[in-house]
Amino acid sequence: MEIRRRSPSPKIRVSYLEYGVPHDDEKPRNILEKIVWEKDREVDLARQKVPLDQLKKKISLLPPTKDFVAALKRAQIKPAVIAEVKKASPSKGVIRDDFDPVAIAKAYAAGGASCLSVLTDKQFFQGGFDVLVQVRETVDLPLLCKEFVLSPYQLFQARAAGADAVLLIAAILTDQDLRYLNKVAQSLGLDVLVEVHDAKELERVLAIGGFSLIGINNRDLATFETDLATTEVLVNQFRDRLHLDTTVLVSESGLFARSDLDRVQAAGAEAVLVGEALMRQEDVESALHALVGA
């Protein structure tokens, strides 16, 4: 699926002043495109509010990042679980009313998660970098910043908030973007989980190379339906090029039971990312224990 970036606003000049004129007739074609367009605006505003130099100064005072990839590889329970701290989503609305990131993070750590994922998008997922900071102050597990990254600035935001890894979504980034953002992330000590949804995106990612974490999202971006066969089909199609002995493959979305984890593990997934299935449970720690079979 092609995701367009919003066209730059045309400029008009009045005397010595220049103004941007919005494209009122241009509309996003789907929810992901809408998120991307809003994220562009959000990042522009964030840059004005918190200059990059301010983020760099904060980062210089932080301890080194934790090794996200190593944590997944050394997990005692397989597949390793990346448990997600998520209040809401565009497709499901509010998932957890009594959303307490600190309590959830503690429950995940006690329940056997190898790493945590934290939603930082505010408008569509009701998350935030403040949530990431709270979780970082609560647990010692490696943290993934789950964000719609379009700009290097967001990588600095993630690192400054305590992330150890970041998500790059192939569907919303060009090959050039993926290469550059991966390079910037590595310079900040951040591991990168690059996410694909179909064969075309996985082909692009493998051609670019340099990713030690590849996520296969089982959710169809057009319908938002999930199908675990997505992981099975893509791994089978690209098995010889995935280098599963060195690359950590993560299956994402649609995982609700231990049988689901067993299914994607049999296909080749060394780790899984689980959010909604846990967030909807009253006792998150017990739910995670049950999911991993511990």
From Swiss-Prot:
One example of a Gene Ontology biological process annotation: L-tryptophan biosynthetic process
Enzyme Commission number, as recorded: 4.1.1.48
Keyword terms of this UniProt record: Amino-acid biosynthesis, Aromatic amino acid biosynthesis, Decarboxylase, Lyase, Tryptophan biosynthesis
Any Pfam family: IGPS
Entry-linked HAMAP family: IGPS_B (MF_00134_B)
Name of encoding gene: trpC
Name listed for the protein in its UniProt record: Indole-3-glycerol phosphate synthase
CDD domains: IGPS
Catalyses which reaction(s): 1-(2-carboxyphenylamino)-1-deoxy-D-ribulose 5-phosphate + H(+) = (1S,2R)-1-C-(indol-3-yl)glycerol 3-phosphate + CO2 + H2O
